Amino acid sequence: MSKANRSLSCIALALTACFLGVTPAVQAQAPGQDAAQAPAPGDKPPQKRPRRTDRIFARDLEGIWISAAYLDALRATRAPLEASKKAAPLVIKVQKEGPSYPLVRTDFDRAVLLRIIDIQPEDKPGAFRVVLAADDMNPVSASETTNISFRGQKNEQGRFERLAVADPTFGKRKFQDVIRLEEGLAPTVNGIVIAGSYADDKGATYSFSRSGEAEVPGGRFRYDLRLSPKGANCSIIEEAQDEAAGPRPRYGFRWKGQALELYEVDAKKPDNLRCGAKPVAVLTPKAG
């Protein structure tokens, strides 16, 4: 599936000398050299060209980025469905794949996959646009590309931690802040929403880890939190199993104060999941 990113590679190679600040070595005057060629008294020695620090490469964007507003809403509600009503989700993933840098964007309902073919500076300081196309191996016309504008400043370590992006598909080209996730999407969301140990009113224990492991009175299983803003009337825990193995067991949940309520899910219509009217268990976080 990997293809050579010819456009980006050619630009990177052409600019290598400038980026590294390479300058010819200055040789000392040899005995008998023409005096006219010798440095005059008081002349300053040649200065090396300063190293460029403002150039942006695809590798600078590598990682998973999430809407800062959505992340704040997730922390406030601890419920993916409610969070998506307060702030539209947006996640961007850039990951090197052979010589290519695919860039995936999603709002958890739809996803768009394109490949980075160029990164170009814009007029304002810290502003640049990423040029994307479905094909990064062959020449493409302007009509076959998508431009996404970004703004951001690298930190002292030369790394982006936060960017503003004007997404044309999921953001109506309005700038919004996105934050780099250090531990990945699922562990971040699990940690905010549900990770922890709980007990019900009968003393039975439940636990959900950041890494996606669940332990309930009925056994252990891998879980995912449903992040799609459509097709359900409550936030849902789904057992992480192949759809080919049959319908995925699901458990609805809502936070009521500090209590985590679990619900049965009616999945007769997979595109319209419904949580029961009353909780089947009410969990209280365990101390420590």
Predicted regions and their residues:
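Bacterial N-terminal signal peptides that target proteins for export
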Residues: 2-12
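Hydrophilic extracytoplasmic domains
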Residues: 230-288
